[in-house]
């Protein structure tokens, strides 16, 4: 008699559970490997300041100049600087400006300078490590950027009784790190963020810090990233070609900030953003602002020329037509706190 292989299922009750167990075990092993595998993560420990503790106010600009010169290839106009309101003395407010990824202090100039002048405040312009270099640009790590932040804060806190931090794009999460890890909270007057990067626009940005990303991401998207600057000044003061590793370093900072859940009362914050920002996810920027636990907060959607969204939406280089509006928003916000 011929066997009926369709009706005869002698091992079906055994094979199916065994297959399910095997698949489940494999999934568990892969999940464990994925969870514990090495991945790019920010070492958020605060480095020690490199600024000499015993230097007078008059000596700080000279130290900063020599420190910048030690890097050898800093583009003129991109270097970190101290701008005194009048003379070397402590002012009621100091403006600390933190530029964004691949940019320099010229990014939104002259907005920080005009805001500072309005209040008779000193200004510290940060230059994040690896930025603004003519040779080997953007080769620094995110942890090197933290060192730049610590040094900039050390100077700003010495030359101002309170500090207004103005930051653009990735400068915003770096400023939040500074607030959490380094500074005395009562020394921060306020935060003013322009296009803050708490998530990049590309929905696959999270892959930049997946396990072994430093090995496989450059193979997928290329070892270099480049873009076409919109004018000669943008070409000078932004790095428009850099290794993909630099983008991974940026994502490390964003990841750290996205996990932060501040619960204590914080310094006032103003956030300025454009809908449909081509670089960052503006919804994430708004969400971070709304969960920031501060009594004084202002959220400003840029409506001037809103049909032409820009990431760097103000400043002489990229959008001079919005500069005065931005200065007015910033000064009114600060005045409302004082």
Can you say where each PLM-predicted feature lies in the sequence?
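Short, surface-exposed "cap/lid" segments of acyl-processing enzymes
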Residues: 73-131
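Short alpha-helix in the alpha/beta-hydrolase fold that links the catalytic acid
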Residues: 110-111, 267, 280-291
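Catalytic nucleophile-loop/oxyanion-hole region of alpha/beta-hydrolase
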Residues: 133-159
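Gly/Ala-rich beta-loop-alpha elbow adjacent to hydrolase catalytic centers
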Residues: 166-175
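Active-site nucleophile loop of the alpha/beta-hydrolase fold
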Residues: 192-203
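Catalytic histidine neighborhood in serine/cysteine hydrolases
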Residues: 292-313
